[in-house]
Amino acid sequence: MEKKRSMTAAPAVAMTAVSMVLTVVVIVMWLGEAMPWAVALVVGLGLDGGWLATLAYERRLAARGDHSRAITGVGWGFGAVATGVLVAHALGEESAGAWLAVAWLPLAAKALWLVHGLWERTALTPTALDQIRDIQQDARDRAAVARAQLRAEAGTEVTRLEAVTGAGARVARVQAETAGELASAWSTLEEAREGEGTARALTCVTSRVTPTSPPSWRLPVWGPTEPVPAAIEGSADVVPLSNEEIDGIMSGLVDSGSYRVAAGRFRDMGYSAGEARLQASWRRVTREVAA
């Protein structure tokens, strides 16, 4: 943990030290011509000291998990002033490009401390990292097992569909062949029945047994031949019940407890009415009883 922490803290510390030394040297070189070098040194150390003090306080707050925008703003202000001093000095020198190349060091140091602070707020202990890795690995394992299971189920379903389709095709072929054979047999029977000598031959055979029967021969009938029952006589004369009459009958069946029982008893009594009318009458009667 400490080793990983130093990976972000060490660059920030090194950049801060270089920028502070550079700032002091530039201030002494720049202001030493107009004032004693001791005064210029004090000015440079004061600028660096203020920046270092705000940085130390900001790091103290970060260690407690706190944050102060005012302190952060003051720290960026010191960094901006130091950068401004370096830029102003570079513009007055003959080799301005070389000085401008290092004028960004104070702001870079401040940015590195910002990155280090962000890393600290998101840093985790090795135990937590191990747990996260275990959770991720477990999720990957479950996803792989689910994908394999889906692929296996898909393969099984494809095999089943192919088997069902093949069986259906075989059944269809057998049915087609059977239908063709039946059609051929019926055609042969029909030709035999319609033949000129068929009726004569059957008449000769059956005349001794049933002399009065007509000489006819019909194809056998396949399936049940129950006669359709005749319609009830006088059903057209039945007068349908009115809503009031249905309500009167259903009011006597309220004690049945449910509509199905009441409807069954209604029909057992010999009455007839549509399902919709019975349901509407039941609702009306039950509302009246409830009221």
Swiss-Prot record:
Localization per Swiss-Prot or TrEMBL: Cell membrane
Entry's Gene Ontology cellular component terms: plasma membrane
Keyword match Chaperone: no
Membrane topology: Multi-pass membrane protein
Domain of life where this protein originates: Bacteria
UniProt keyword terms in alphabetical order: Cell membrane, Membrane, Plasmid, Transmembrane, Transmembrane helix
Leader sequence segment: none
Transmembrane segments: 24-44, 71-91, 99-119
Purpose: Involved in plasmid transfer.
Name this protein carries in UniProt: Protein SpdB
Species whose genome carries this gene: Streptomyces lividans
